[in-house]
From Swiss-Prot:
Organism: Solidesulfovibrio magneticus (strain ATCC 700980 / DSM 13731 / RS-1)
Disulfide links within the chain: none
Alphabetical list of Pfam families matching this protein: GreA_GreB, GreA_GreB_N
Protein name per UniProt: Transcription elongation factor GreA
Signal peptide positions (record): none
Length: 164
């Protein structure tokens, strides 16, 4: 089994989510029991909604639990260097348009593109890994191939925790 990189903060966030989901379980089971007591289950929207919620809850619990044992927890405060690795914040410039983007490379379970972090397994993340300032990368995008130049690589320690 291959290990999955995750920051200490990302791991803690998933631990909190797992704990919260497990605390929700009894309430969902009770909702199913109460809906079942209402009679005919074929036309019982409350029962169907509770069963659907239970299915989603159990699926997420199982997913997190199965990943936990595979995580390689990395303290971002210990990282540094001149090469793009997990935890690096990289500034890239589109060679054709001059547009500049900044991303922090994180594991697939904690990446949030809307907050500036991407998975190191994403097309951009994979293209950046192992590169240095001044290197150019090519990313296949829906609008075609995009050439980027790496402008800067920085390591900032722990990332700000996202709202749960």
């Amino acid at each position: 089994m291959e290990s999955i990189p995750i920051s200490v903060e990302g791991f803690r966030r998933l631990e909190r989510e797992l704990e919260r989901l497990k605390k929700e379980r009894p309430g969902v089971i009770l909702a199913i029991k109460e809906a079942r007591e209402e009679g005919d289950l074929r036309e019982n929207a409350g029962y169907e909604a509770a069963r659907e919620r239970q299915g989603m809850l159990e699926a997420r619990i199982n997913y997190i639990e199965s990943r936990m044992s595979r995580f390689n927890v990395i303290d971002l405060a210990t990282l540094g260097g001149e090469q793009v690795i997990f935890g690096a914040t990289v500034e890239i410039e589109d060679v054709d348009t001059g547009d500049v983007k900044k991303y922090t490379l994180l594991g697939p379970d904690e990446a949030e593109p809307s907050k500036g972090s991407i998975s190191l397994l994403s097309p951009v993340g994979l293209a950046l890994l192992g590169k240095f300032v001044g290197d150019e990368i090519v990313v296949d995008a829906p609008r075609g191939k995009i050439n980027y130049e790496i402008v800067s690589i920085a390591f900032h320690g722990p990332i700000a925790a996202a709202d749960d």
